[in-house]
Amino acid sequence: MARTQVPDPATSAPAERALWLRDELERANYAYYVLDQPDLPDAEYDRLFKELQQIESEHPDLITPDSPTQRVGGEVASGFRPVVHDMPMLSLNNGFSDEDIAAFDKRVSDTLHHTPVDYACELKFDGLAISLRYVDGQFTQAATRGDGATGEDVTENVRTIRSIPLKLKGKRVPKLVDVRGEVLMFRRDFDKLNQRQRDAGQREFANPRNAAAGSLRQLDPKMTAQRPLSFFAYGIGVLDGIEMPGTHSELLDWYHEMGLPVNSERAVVQGAEGVLGFFHKVGEKRDKLPYDIDGVVYKVNRRDEQDALGFVSRAPRFALAHKFPAQEALTKLIAIDVQVGRTGAITPVARLEPVFVGGATVTNATLHNEDEVRRKDIRIGDTVIVRRAGDVIPEVVGALLERRPPDAREFVMPTQCPVCGSAIERLPDEAIARCSGGLFCPAQRKQALWHFAQRRALDIDGLGEKIIDQLVELNLVRTPADLFNLGFATLAELDRFAEKSAQNLIDSLEKAKHTTLARFIYALGIRHVGESTAKDLARHFGSLDPIMSATVEELLEVNDVGPIVAEAIHQFFAEEHNRTVIEQLRAPGKVTWAEGPPAPKAPQGVLAGKTVVLTGTLPNMGRDEAKELLEAAGAKVAGSVSKKTDYVVAGAEAGSKLAKAEELGIPVLDEDGMRKLLEGQTT
């Protein structure tokens, strides 16, 4: 679609700005509804739409019949038969703030002449709206929303969605009903689909919404049948042969009775205070839901009151979509710097013009690695899409190529570490470039010290990041061994470090001198060596010296140590500087641990030789306690599920590990089942 030059909203004439806004919104609609390739974040679309609404309200003569404010969606794609909706599928007006919700409630209550008003609250799914037609209880047709008046016939594709009944059940089945709802894809199903795409060497989907839309609109229903789509009913069109339920909540209950899938995250509340309470409650658990939502929908609950409120050109007056803070937004990429991680990993970081996204102001976002920058074709000066969901680190999703300035510059990975000046190296088979400076690099030094002090490493309480920053910047500590040379007087002089804090840290350091071999190995920060591998090494060799002198072949004999991990361990101990630091750490008066003979080849215990994975929250014990009990029984507790896993112990809010176990047919136990297993009872 042709593009027009972007007029400045501050200086351009309203007619010129409105023309550009209509063009930009229509282009975005086409990409979203027809191509299933949205390239404009929802928040940016909403902002532009609101601006066009404002211009048209101030200048009614600028309203055109084809303005996006006068219609619902996009054009009917070729390849599907058009379906005219007997009752239009309208979209909803949006609210973004508490003030918007209060204003909506006031308009409703003023029109109805009473307060408080009962509202049915439900989730706003991030999927594709469709209409299902049932005649005498039999599913006969499915159509997409399209432009609201005319959609696309996707009947054969929808027949493949297992959650949609082909025949309604119960005693109150109508002669005719158009069920409105949303086709979506659960996150776990989306992850599985993308894994299949990767395995087949095919393009991955950007998000569950794209995957759902693309899957539903496959020309071959057999392709749709292979895609794990789901459906929730939430509205109604034409109804014949039975009386319309008196409230929206009763409508959804009736749907449920007839076997239609209805989401359980819903409630009937009173007034603005009630809907805002529901909104904030849902917002707190949004990231834990198994599917994507982008807000909450409020509908006046009583049907007669809905009829009294009526409709405007594109939306009902009795409903409002309350949108969450956008998880995606547009901003300008000012620069690309690189940061150095604990293991020397060089990560490109986008420096951004400040943008509010995901409930926070974002100025930096990860670009992951050099290959990702190239794949996404991100350049300095671009207008980029930034995504921030929950506590996830903000990332740059992509660039708007149509807004790229002529002077946009490609990113060039530096050849020297920005912190220590050492050479940056990248192995042929790895995506990550790394600083070769090792523990000499101050950036790595800080991260290495922080890792060394972690609770699961040497557990040095009081040695936080700010203290480590001071110790390194004042050149008081260069390696982990230097920590044990620190004295009370030195610590007491640190900025914002009182005498009590200094003494507490001295006590923590003294306590940390007495540890286990496994903790010490983990504390060294060897690449690819986590807690589990550190324990395997300690059990297999019994003492540190054999590990330090082991060949790659000898390391490969350790349980679950593969070629990559074996090579990383071997290279770490082959580096003379690392050996020097280790000798300093185990010098007299420094770190000690109990050493013993190598573990027997076959571990003892009722779970000897078994691999167990923990996931979710157990009701009566923490994960660490469960892990210790399993390991004491001879089990290896792994961090991920594979074909080698013998059992998965799942608690509340178990995630992808549980899904993986079910997919592989691995036995899944709850806490009671785990206890029985520990007692020697088979499952």
UniProtKB/Swiss-Prot annotation:
The UniProt record lists the keyword Manganese: yes
Highest taxon in the source lineage: Bacteria
GO cellular component labels: cytosol
GO molecular function: DNA binding; DNA ligase (NAD+) activity; metal ion binding
Cofactor: Mg(2+); Mn(2+)
Positions of Zn(2+) binding: 417, 420, 435, 441
Residues given in the record as NAD(+) binding sites: 42-46, 91-92, 122, 145, 182, 299, 323
BRCT domain location: 602-683
Record EC number: 6.5.1.2
Active-site feature positions: 124 (n6-amp-lysine intermediate)
Swiss-Prot/TrEMBL GO biological process terms: DNA repair; DNA replication
Catalytic reactions of this protein: NAD(+) + (deoxyribonucleotide)n-3'-hydroxyl + 5'-phospho-(deoxyribonucleotide)m = (deoxyribonucleotide)n+m + AMP + beta-nicotinamide D-nucleotide
Gene3D superfamilies to which the protein is assigned, alphabetical: 5' to 3' exonuclease, C-terminal subdomain, 6.20.10.30, BRCT domain, DNA ligase/mRNA capping enzyme, Helix hairpin bin, Nucleic acid-binding proteins
SMART domains, sorted: BRCT, HhH1, LIGANc
Transmembrane region(s): none
UniProtKB keywords: DNA damage, DNA repair, DNA replication, Ligase, Magnesium, Manganese, Metal-binding, NAD, Zinc
UniProt similarity note: Belongs to the NAD-dependent DNA ligase family. LigA subfamily.
Functional description taken from the UniProt entry: DNA ligase that catalyzes the formation of phosphodiester linkages between 5'-phosphoryl and 3'-hydroxyl groups in double-stranded DNA using NAD as a coenzyme and as the energy source for the reaction. It is essential for DNA replication and repair of damaged DNA.
Protein name per Swiss-Prot or TrEMBL: DNA ligase
Annotated organism of origin: Paraburkholderia phymatum (strain DSM 17167 / CIP 108236 / LMG 21445 / STM815) (Burkholderia phymatum)
Lineage: Bacteria, Pseudomonadati, Pseudomonadota, Betaproteobacteria, Burkholderiales
The gene coding this protein: ligA
